[in-house]
Amino acid sequence: MIYKGIAATTKVDAHNIRIAKEALEQAAHDINEGKCAPAVVIEHDLTILPIGKVYKAFVDSFDEEDYALHIEQEIFENVSSTIVNGEKYMVVKSDVDDRPFASDIISNNEKLIVGTDSVNFESDEKAKEYLNGLRAEFDIDVQRFCRKSVIPDPELVFQLVENSVKYLLIYLCSKQVVERVGDVLVDTAVNEAKNLYALVKKAIKAGSKYLIPENRPVTYIFKGSFNYIIELIVKTTNPDVAISALNKEKLKEAIDKIDNIKEQFPKILRVQLIYNENEDKWEFNYLTTEVGVVIGTEQSYKKAAKLAEIYLGNSGDINTDASTQTDDVL
């Protein structure tokens, strides 16, 4: 199913952000000619599997003074199921575009990046105060982004560098693997894990004092690339739950689940696990492949399909996966 619409204009929006015509033209070029394509997502919620893909765009006049980015987006209708080791998975893919999703391509950052949405702070100054406080204590980069929504639930993103992911995997490995890699790598991995845990704990605890709306669940996203992207997401109102979800035993369980998924679906580009607070464990949600196929649990697909029906019927908050970035580094 193809939907046509306007993704952005050069008018000043509700967040007091004005996008230049040149930026719209670059976005159109990237959508048409780029190696990846933006996903169509619901309410900027990464835990809901992508329901479509933006595959064509152009810039045209919007009124006498402004311009608009017109897009064509496909809402996926090619859906099938497969049974692997007794588990049912839903397979969703495009009929018109086989590029990977833009959200599945992350930069090779030199430092760990902590990112958050400026709208989830009382003021721009408070956002800078929070992020600069972390940067003063830890050797990291910080980033602010802007989701085009009124006041979305708070979100904190931790993007690890590749070496950190490697060392973390070593730290979580079995005794036999540890003995093979040697003491130097093991010591480095242990120190890396300790430093990472200290940063995450501080960021989560400090964030609970700054983020708004209060008493709303915070989405904590931990992602990094090592051959493919690993994405772990905790959504909770309790900061201690997010910290507990990252202890060594639970992370080991998460990596074991990912290894099993990788054996079943070897062409993974990104794999996402969600922490189930009620059952105190990590659960597979969905994965994406090199050709833009989405494979998820039956539960995750049904949730996405139901929300898509509601939002498409009501012309709701259907978004591309590209957020406006307001600062690379403060």
Please name every model-derived segment.
Residues 2-156, 220-245, 291-293, 303, ...:
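Membrane-active, amphipathic/fusogenic segments and juxtamembrane/transmembrane anchors
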Residues 36-44, 140-151, 202-217, 261-281:
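Short glycine-rich, low-complexity/disordered patches
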Residues 24-35, 130-138, 197-208, 254-265:
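Hydrophobic, Leu/Ile/Phe/Ala-enriched alpha-helical segments that form helix-helix packing faces
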Residues 227-307:
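A long, low-hydrophobicity, low-complexity, charged/polar interaction segment common
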Residues 139-211:
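Membrane-inserting effector segments that mediate pore formation, membrane fusion
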Residues 188-257:
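Amphipathic, membrane-active segments
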